[in-house]
UniProtKB/Swiss-Prot annotation:
Matrin-type zinc finger segments: 4-36
Keywords: Metal-binding, Nucleus, Ribonucleoprotein, RNA-binding, Zinc, Zinc-finger
Highest taxon listed in the record's lineage: Eukaryota
Renumbered residue ranges of the record's region Disordered: 105-207
Species, as recorded: Arabidopsis thaliana
Transmembrane stretches, start-end: none
Biased composition (Pro residues): 105-115, 122-131, 162-183
Family annotation (InterPro entries): Matrin/U1-C_Znf_C2H2, Matrin/U1-like-C_Znf_C2H2, U1-CZ_Znf_C2H2, U1_snRNP-C, Znf_C2H2_sf
Subunit relationships: U1 snRNP is composed of the 7 core Sm proteins B/B', D1, D2, D3, E, F and G that assemble in a heptameric protein ring on the Sm site of the small nuclear RNA to form the core snRNP, and at least 3 U1 snRNP-specific proteins U1-70K, U1-A and U1-C. U1-C interacts with U1 snRNA and the 5' splice-site region of the pre-mRNA.
Alphabetical GO biological process terms: mRNA 5'-splice site recognition; spliceosomal snRNP assembly
PROSITE patterns: ZF_MATRIN (PS50171)
Cellular localisation: Nucleus
Protein name per UniProt: U1 small nuclear ribonucleoprotein C
The family this protein is said to belong to: Belongs to the U1 small nuclear ribonucleoprotein C family.
């Protein structure tokens, strides 16, 4: 006679009759085993759900990591910006920055000798043009066959030349004369102070 096997209790019943199975299913051991079985089943389902969500999250994070890796590779492939060089060290082949034009000196200011005058002050007459009509920038050597020497030097005798480069159309200032030295005695009321020869007498005294 075959016996009935209970999956929840993992036991064989003595008889396979419906009355015996009904009596076994009504017992407290069978009910406790059924409760434990479904609790384990729910725990397994919950764990499998958690594992699935974790795998999905890791898959998305992996996709983000792949995108980030591709972006980093793209950034590394781009050329880096040039480094700032310290002032005074220019690489070979590069032109230095263009400096602004010098400011015009104030009215009446004369540049030192040897320095070419960039701009004449307002109202000053312009120097005469060269003989052959070719203008040269200040500081440039003269053209062969044309009079004049380098800036700051007088023209060579026998050759025609224009005014010096520092000429601005104004006459030179008069020489500065110092006052005669005072006598060491400090006598400022001496009548013979202006007379260079004190022994000479005036013609009025002889009369």
């Amino acid at each position: 006679m075959p016996r009935y096997y209970c999956d929840y209790c993992d036991t064989y019943l003595t008889h396979d009759s419906p009355s015996v199975r009904k009596q076994h299913n009504a017992g407290y051991k069978h009910k406790a085993n059924v409760r434990i079985y479904y609790q384990q089943f729910e725990e397994q389902q919950t764990q499998s759900l958690i594992d699935q969500r974790i795998k999905e999250h890791l898959g998305q994070t992996g996709g983000y990591q792949q995108v980030g890796a591709v972006f980093n590779q793209h950034m590394l492939a781009r050329p880096r910006p040039p480094m700032m060089l310290p002032p005074g060290s220019m690489p070979m082949g590069m032109r230095p920055p263009v400096l602004p034009r010098p400011m015009m000196p104030p009215q009446g200011y004369m540049p030192p000798p040897g320095v070419p005058q960039m701009m004449a002050p307002p109202g000053a007459p312009l120097p005469p043009p060269p003989q052959n009509g070719i203008l040269r920038p200040p500081g440039m050597a003269p053209i062969p066959g044309q009079g004049g020497g380098p800036p700051g030097m007088a023209p060579i005798p026998g050759q025609g030349g224009g005014p010096p480069p520092n000429y601005n159309g104004l006459p030179p200032p008069p020489p500065y004369h110092t006052n005669p030295a005072a006598p060491p005695s400090g006598n400022f009321n001496n009548p013979n102070l202006n007379n260079p020869n004190p022994s000479a007498e005036s013609p009025e005294s002889n009369e």
